Regions:
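A phosphate-binding catalytic loop at a beta-strand-loop-alpha-helix junction
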Residues: 34-51
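Short acidic-glycine loop/turn motifs at beta-strand connectors
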Residues: 177-183
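Catalytic-core segments of class I nucleotidyltransferases/pyrophosphorylases
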Residues: 133-134, 141, 147-154, 167-170, ...
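A short, conserved acidic/glycine-rich loop-to-beta-strand motif
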Residues: 156-165
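Conserved N-terminal catalytic core of the sugar/cofactor nucleotidyltransferase
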Residues: 21-39, 61, 65-137, 143-148, ...
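Aromatic (phenylalanine/tyrosine) cluster motif
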Residues: 6, 12-13
Length: 280
């Protein structure tokens, strides 16, 4: 069977029908092992106060586990090994809990923020990488197969790939469309609004560092706007996996209701049901 090369990645990945010798690592396993991961774990979690006054948001419990514990278990089972935790608020508690990652089968390094750098800012201060970087918010509960978004990034030769989730919400009013002269062109009674939201899951090519200022606050929306202004390829990976950001009290409560029902799924690998990609 022919092999397909994924973007600038030098590894060749076998198709699903290829056979491989016993005990030989699969191409996806190699991809995960060679992909560095950054988890953003430095936020103050102001929307979850007063709980986050004494406990950093990544240590907030979901079921029997801190949310970041669940994420590290998933990454480890999927084959990712090199993890950097970007920490700030109550960083000592996070480091005391996870240490160097040996209990999770990963190697953890810590990047410390003395002043808030936003969501994208910490990337500029990391050592230069030769491979694409998987970046995750540290407060995610999801069943995404992270290897798939990394592979999608290479297949699409992107500079930045954003994990997205489709949301549909009803508009509570009748929606009118009108031209400049007031002429009504359409009237829809309480239509559904369909849109994509960011999952807080990203893959960035090494060159993305060139677009991030050092030592100042810089968020992912700022980075995407700068990339687009410079005609860089930014793509959306649309996922059907379960996803919840626990940053709001209602969502945190929902995550704690969902986790016991799906614990076996959350702590398994290759659990994502489907995903498609869309250019943005």
């Amino acid at each position: 069977m022919p092999r397909q090369k994924f973007g600038e990645e030098r590894q060749y990945f076998e198709s699903a029908n290829d056979t491989k010798p016993m005990n030989k690592p699969s191409p996806m396993t190699i991809l995960c092992e060679q992909t560095p991961v950054v988890i953003l774990a430095g936020g103050k979690g102001t929307r979850l106060m007063p709980y986050t006054t004494a406990l950093p948001k990544p240590l907030m419990p979901v079921g029997e586990y801190p949310i970041l514990d669940i994420l590290l278990r998933q990454l480890s089972k999927q084959g990712f090994r090199r993890i950097t935790l970007a920490v700030g608020h109550l960083a000592g508690l996070i480091q005391a809990y996870f240490k160097q990652g040996q209990d999770w089968g990963v190697e953890i390094e810590y990047a410390y923020e003395t002043t808030p750098l936003g969501t994208a800012g910490p990337i500029a201060r990391l050592p230069r990488q030769e491979r694409a970087l998987l970046v995750l918010n540290g407060d995610l509960l999801t069943t995404m197969d992270f290897a798939k978004i990394v592979r999608f990034h290479y297949e699409n030769r992107a500079v930045a790939t954003i994990g997205t989730k489709r949301r549909t919400e009803p508009v509570q009013f009748g929606v009118i469309e009108a031209g400049p002269n007031g002429q009504i062109t359409d009237y829809k009674e309480k239509p559904n609004l369909d849109y994509l939201v960011s999952m807080g899951i990203y893959v960035f090519a090494p060159t993305v560092r060139e677009y991030i200022p050092r030592s100042q606050k810089f968020d992912f929306p700022d980075l995407v706007q700068r990339l687009l202004a410079n005609q860089q390829r930014v793509v959306a990976y649309e996922s059907e996996a379960y996803w919840m950001d626990i940053g709001r009290p209602d969502d945190y409560q929902q995550a704690n209701e969902d986790f016991p029902k799906m614990e076996g799924i959350f702590l398994k690998t290759n659990v994502e049901s489907a995903a498609v990609g869309t250019r943005i």
